Amino acid sequence: MRLNLVIVFLLLVCCVFTCLSAFAQLPPPKKDPLIPTQATQGSTGCSTTEASSCAQAAAKILPIVMGASPLEENLRRLTDEVGGRVTGTPEMAKAVEWGVGAFRAAGVDVHAERYTLPVTWSEGDTRLEMLGPVKFPVRLKAEGWSPATPAGGIEANVVDVGFGNEDDFAKAGGVVKGAILLVHSDIGSTWADLFNEYLRPPMIIDRAVREGAAAILWMGARERLLLYRHTNSLAGEIDKIPQAMAAREDAMRLARTIAAYPGKVRVRFHMPNKIGGPIEQENVVGEIRGYEKPDEIVILGAHLDSWELGTGALDNGCNAALVIEAARAIKATGLLPRRTIRFVLFSGEEQGTVGSFEYVKAHRTELDKIRAMITFDAGIGRVTGYSLGGRRDIAAGVREVLKPLESWGANNHTYDASFGTDNFDFLLEGVPTLVANQEEANYLPNYHAASDTMDKVDIRELKLHTALAALTAWGIADRAEPLGKRLTRAELEVLVKETGLGQQLKVLGYWNAWQSGKRGRKP
């Protein structure tokens, strides 16, 4: 069914606005939060009926985290020695070993939990050969979960379809059939631009398949020939059509050549991606058991996997190391929380949050007792607060927990609900979720790129985030009352509608799974 252009445009605007709110630029960065004071000792604690356990915990956690620690060495070993780690590869297996070993060294109980990854994917030798009338090199990388080209590659004309909207396809006409399509992009510089890189492709891919195109070349949104990789199939499945990301300057040169020689630019496209599976994969799970309500759980998580062009330092090695360091710090205080704190390193996030989806399925009987799921997944930009997944009912509790760090400027929360990281399936199951809202810092230029390496990580900033994460998990776990309840399906239906999450689910292809109960709390 052909979508009206106006509806498509409005849908994208709604989705981008919803996603942008998750990373809204709140107050400008504060002065150094550790000067002149480390924590507000006189703060109200985790409950109005008890002493300031959060302030006491903060006073113990801060010197442990900010002092000498294994954080930097743990991150170095993960990024420099293990390197990029695509789920389903030997490097991912090494990353799991790294996580288990680091938790054990921190004195935290740990185990790995298996699940079945239906499909594995890795890139082969991706090449684009210009056959004429002009020849020049085009640097490109396969898009994640793209199918391989046939043996011998695809030989076809390249057709410029602009930004890939309905009008662009209509102007191109019948020449789209059997062609390789070049799709333009604007330069990306904001969180909204990044989310748009995920929101645009599904409809463009559907148009390309419907019109019989052979493959798609996406123009990179970053300058200076920087190569990076996204996935346009967000459900852990091989995509519908071969796709690659071309370096921006090369793609623009290709567009100019097509304009100069209409209908004559011909190429041979080789992309022998390796597709396998199913295969057993693992999430890494550490735990500090609660002393009073051990069956109630607060999860602090981050994804361990990455793409392999760089070494996955900003996305998301630094936050995998953060989770382990937060566990070490809490353990080292000698304090026990009322509830169990579970520390989870998820795999399969880059393939469409597969690992966290499988975790939720495996722990479905526990979901009523999971009091919060906290996750970090945006590099080392200063944390301004949390995205609370549409849950205004938990805001006061979160502010109370973070009151000991009032001067840090990290208690400004948003109420958006969006797809994008491992909170997703917990949110759809009605569990309270907290996703760290962070300033952009150097995340966007290096996201999924060859430049995502450890030298981009500000270790001191990472330590501050670790202290914040540890106190958040501790405070929620040690509250006298739960932070918030698990929402019913009816309540989730309202949340999905009011936050605009439903629009995202439709654009990204999750709507039917949500409606049927395959994804999220069952009707």
Which sequence ranges carry the predicted segments?
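N-terminal capping segment at the start of a domain
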Residues: 48-89, 115, 125, 227-232, ...
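Second-shell loop/turn segments in exported
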Residues: 58-66, 80-90, 160, 189-199, ...
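His/Asp/Glu-rich mid-to-C-terminal helical/loop segments that flank catalytic regions of hydrolases
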Residues: 328, 444-509, 513-523
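Metal-dependent peptidase/peptidase-like ectodomains
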Residues: 66, 137, 251, 293, ...
